[in-house]
Amino acid sequence: MGISKDEYLKEEKILSKVQKLLGDTLNELGKDVYQDEEDFTEFKKMMWENSSSFDAGEMRQVMAATEQEAEKVLQKQRYFKKLCQIKTKPYFASIVFKDDHGKIWNIYISLTYLKDDDFNNILYDWRSPICSLFYDYEVGPCSYVAPGGEYFGELKRKRQYKIENCKLVGVFDNSLNIDDEVLQEVLAHESSDKMKNVVNTIQQEQNQVIRNLEDHNLIVQGIAGSGKTTVALHRIAFLLYRL
């Protein structure tokens, strides 16, 4: 269902704050990436110029150090590219989760994570454990599994957004997960419970396949265009995130 005008204005303010933080982070990270590339080039040059004085054991250590430095640079570059990807559409959904200790968590779900200067999570990567609540549950009692164990609580709200060119153009609350933009626009006004339940079942089953950690081999059957390839690609992304 649609949300009130006050709620809509509140969401616009949140989007504005996220956009500013995202812009600031990109500026700082861009400088870091550029400097890292220069430093790494100098590091390789130094290693190469001194390589003749290394024995076999020292050379292995040099190679390992070089690979380690290269991986640090690549990780930062990959994160920078991800932030560039979400610059105009920083997030697509949010949940309000009340844990069994009474603490309220406002989780904004994105393609990657974003932290503020105090290292607080502002955006959560969709692959993180707590974000599975958005895909697996309707509003009500819920739980998710994280490295520290299983956490219980109540899903108070599920909200989805349509953001275009940094502007909020659509928001609706729904107990379900709707992945289709046309359906989002319809549901922002009204639709039958039957339609909502059908879409929810599909999305929930897809998420179960994507996040399955118990079975090493999975067989997914479906007609052409049913989303098998999409599920496979998202499963690969999820498994890589878990490494």
Regions found by a protein language model. Give the residues of each.
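Walker A/P-loop NTP-binding motif
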Residues: 230-243
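Conserved glycine(s) of the Walker
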Residues: 225-228
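Pre-Walker A (Motif I) flank of P-loop NTPase domains
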Residues: 214-218
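Extended, charged low-complexity regulatory segments
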Residues: 1-199, 203-211
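Hydrophobic anchor at the beta1->P-loop junction of P-loop NTPases
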Residues: 220-222
